[in-house]
């Protein structure tokens, strides 16, 4: 006989040994041997194979997904045939065979660039959108995007385990920078608009990762607030309303000024009055002043 033993990987079900048998016999025409009538000694016929060849047949090795099989240390998928040997005319058992297994290497998953701006298993786009709302203009969006990929130095995005079929993805990094896990949204300075104050003069730079959520920031503009000042005039002379505003030069172009009620300049004295400031967008602000006549 020859026995094929299987050494399976940990966690795998055992594979039963396979025993190969080559049957020999002494039978020749129904006679196994002859006995000497004088001495009584029996002379046996030589052993010979009962049928077939005097060899252990080749045998296919049972395969395990994700592993390479080895026969007595040599990578192979079948146990080779082996001649039966004899010693002093007696057929001998064949050498036992050991089948072992080695796990195959992980299968590379090639990196694919994908579609610009579209997230997938291999690409991640992290975007900050800054929307600038300048007065009298359509909003303008400024996109700041950091592209992250999983591509390694070998052009692969990950590796698939041949046994489980699970893919382990490479860590995210900034596209083109293998060792840079973090990217940056750059600092953004809001446009300066005469007569208006931005809701924020700048948007600070920010470090981001592939897990950072997309963000949208709106920058709006409010007109500069008017500052009132007292006005001096002569009896009978009504001053222009804009004289009651100290910071006209800081206000938006096209701002208009009017008296809420025309001040009484018919007599001397300090007369309370109100200047109505009308911005280009139509909003108004009332500014209390004193008119000295």
Predicted feature residues:
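C-terminal edge beta-strand
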Residues: 285-293
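Surface-exposed interfaces of beta-sheet-rich extracellular modules
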Residues: 44-88, 169-207, 257
